[in-house]
Amino acid sequence: MKEEHVHGYRFFRTVVGFFYKLYYKPTIINKEAIPKEGPIIICGNHIHLFDQNTACISTDRMIHYMAKKEHLEGPFGWFFKLSGCISVNREIHDENAKNHALDLLNHGYALGLFPEGTRNQVWGKEEVNKKLYELYKNKIPYKKYIKILKANQVCVSEIMLLDILLEQKKITKEEYKDNALNASVFIEKLLEEKRITEEEYDESLLLPLKFGAVSMAQKTGATIIPVITTGKYVFKNNHLNSRFGNPIKVPADMNLEEAKELLRKEMVRLKKEGLKDIKEGKI
């Protein structure tokens, strides 16, 4: 099996990578963790459309990202196709996409995916977004509300934790309303005050992971390379950084739940390191 669109991918990686680095000036840590050959699955958190750029500019290898079919059928579909993306229909259990990905891995190529399965941002999730806005609709215009969500990068996983804490009466309704639009700061404060456990805090950092990455790694012998991006996709003072973690293998006899938890722990570790470096002014 020969990779398609290799020349187009290299051209766009060079062009897009140039402007990406020029505009965002990301700090990339431990890119040497990406093997130069053999089947690999790059597994990252998902906070922005440009998340895949970090991996793409960190290796000479072509990385085939799995992307929802709407991206490939939209006005920039040509770009996603030339970038080697695999079209995924999220409305069904897309066996064609899965088989294509497995085929690539079995031939020793590189796959990229986001094991959370979706972007972890409240402003882009209609159901969560509308429910949260009910708390503020009498005080904040909707456009301003969305602007605040984007500026503070309020994550769905953070709101999920706040919902649980409210239900368990670990926080009050007033605290929820006063802090939901800056959830990460509030959750960190709760941890410092020992009102929540470290495990609860960890739950706020990522959405629950899907089994796809560890399942494909087990079936093909591919190595999983975790990568986590923290900071903001803005022009100045963004503290944008991505760090690659320890490689993960999933032996044939390993329980997939155990493998998924292993991947999650490594991704959480990387995110904590990124947040710590930002807080300490290292990035």
Task: Identify the residue ranges that each predicted region occupies.
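A generic local structural motif
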Residues: P26-K31, F50-Q52, L72, K98-N99, ...
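Short, basic, glycine/proline-bearing loop/turn elements
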Residues: V15-V16, L82-N89, R195-Y201
